[in-house]
């Protein structure tokens, strides 16, 4: 064990002991670690991996279902990639000219790899709730132990199902000290407990009744917002149109203009 270990919460310490017991002594391939936002799942797993003498990115690989989720791990100091980049190859139809220059390329499908790096002893799967049972089955087919982490309150996979988080081995419940004042974490806790968000400003979160959110108020809120989270693609498109109109961008201007943020929707880590 690492003698200079950081201070863990009580449930983090319990989870760490169970994970190490599972990794060294149990034959089961999967360990399911659940935890709500702010409970320190990423911190705990990174600590446990290093405490067991594994090397993140080498003997222990961290993967997530999307590039966005993987980038969150990377920003936390954990080397990570997507599940698909680990276990699949991309099959493409590529057209070249007489000089061998690529004219066009069209993605066809993902094909499961025959094998992955033999030095991998542990796969850490983050955001497990978003991984379909089919992809999970492919991931487990390589026979490597898999530590599956996730938040049971998050979204299920698009067009699929995932039952892992309904049967966790251990669940982190205690919000770590540095997250207790996070207004988003507080709001999530309140909703999970069956309460309703309180209207008004809570830190950087502003909760507004739909019936009061007229155009003037939306303009005021949108002008100072760094990000706007919505529930559907339809609402997202409507909000984007409204914000662009507020900034004087004509509706026929479909391409991005200077200063607009972009969201890359295709995971292709080779480019």
Task: Please place each PLM-identified region on the residue numbering.
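Post-Walker A helix-loop "phosphate-sensing" segment adjacent to the P-loop in P-loop NTPases
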Residues: 50-61
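Short, conserved phosphate/pyrophosphate- and ester-handling motifs at nucleotide-, phospho-/glycolipid
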Residues: 12, 66, 232
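Conserved SAM-binding loop
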Residues: 8, 62, 228
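N-terminal pre-Walker A segment at the start of P-loop NTPase domains
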Residues: 1-18
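Inter-Walker segment of RecA-like/P-loop motor cores
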Residues: 61-118
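Hydrophobic positions on the alpha1 helix immediately C-terminal to the Walker A/P-loop
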Residues: 44, 48
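Conserved helicase motor core of P-loop NTPases
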Residues: 15-31, 39, 138-144, 149-271
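SF2 helicase catalytic motif II
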Residues: 118-136, 146-154
């Amino acid at each position: 064990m690492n003698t200079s270990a950081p201070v863990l919460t009580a449930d983090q310490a319990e989870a760490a002991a169970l994970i190490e017991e599972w990794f060294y002594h149990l034959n089961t391939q999967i360990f399911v670690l659940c935890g709500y936002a702010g409970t320190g799942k990423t911190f705990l797993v990174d600590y446990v991996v290093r405490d067991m003498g594994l090397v993140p990115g080498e003997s222990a690989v961290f993967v997530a279902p999307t590039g966005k989720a993987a980038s969150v791990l990377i920003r936390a100091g954990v080397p990570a990639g997507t599940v698909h980049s680990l276990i699949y190859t991309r099959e493409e139809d590529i057209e070249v000219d007489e000089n061998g220059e690529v004219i066009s390329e069209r993605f066809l499908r993902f094909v499961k790899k025959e094998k992955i790096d033999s030095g991998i002893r542990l796969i850490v799967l983050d955001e497990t709730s978003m991984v379909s049972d089919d992809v999970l089955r492919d991931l487990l087919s390589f026979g490597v132990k898999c530590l599956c982490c996730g938040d049971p309150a998050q979204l299920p996979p698009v067009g699929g199902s995932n039952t892992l988080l309904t049967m966790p081995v251990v669940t982190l419940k205690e919000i770590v000290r540095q997250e207790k004042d996070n207004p988003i974490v507080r709001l999530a806790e309140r909703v999970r407990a069956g309460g309703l968000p309180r209207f008004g400003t809570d830190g950087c979160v502003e909760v507004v009744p739909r019936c009061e959110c007229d155009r003037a108020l939306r303009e005021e809120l949108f002008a100072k917002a760094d990000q706007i989270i919505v529930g559907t693609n339809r609402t997202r498109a409507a909000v984007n149109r409204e914000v662009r109109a507020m900034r004087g961008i004509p509706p026929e201007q479909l391409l991005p203009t200077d200063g607009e943020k972009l969201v890359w929707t295709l995971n292709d880590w080779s480019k």
